[in-house]
Regions:
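A short, Lys/Arg-rich alpha-helix, primarily the initiator
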Residues: 2-28
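The alpha-helix within a helix-turn-helix
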Residues: 26, 37, 65
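Short, basic-rich loop-to-helix N-cap that marks the start of a DNA-contacting helix
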Residues: 53-66
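Short C-terminal boundary/hinge segments that cap the last helix of small helical domains
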Residues: 69-80
Length: 80
């Protein structure tokens, strides 16, 4: 059974981990956020916010994962 998130702090921690993982995957492509966002048609301000663990829509996250060529399952597999 999956663990439940027990507090707002935990949600914030999870958001930061999601952002860190997006940043890690982008950096593995040897791209800074400005170049990567331009090449993939993603607003650089939005990408920067996501990478900092700020609010992100599911639609935006799915678009980014598609551009990174990463499945949702693989992306969340390492996030605890």
């Amino acid at each position: 059974m999956a663990k439940k998130i027990s507090s707002e702090a935990s949600v914030d921690q999870q958001m930061k981990k999601i952002g860190e993982k997006v940043r890690e995957l982008r950096r593995q492509m040897n791209q800074n956020y400005e170049a990567w966002s331009y090449l993939n048609g993603i607003n650089k301000v939005s990408l920067n916010r996501i990478e900092r663990g700020e609010n992100v829509t599911m639609k935006m996250l799915l678009e980014i994962l598609k551009k990174l060529d990463v499945s949702v399952q693989d992306f969340f597999n390492g996030i605890r």
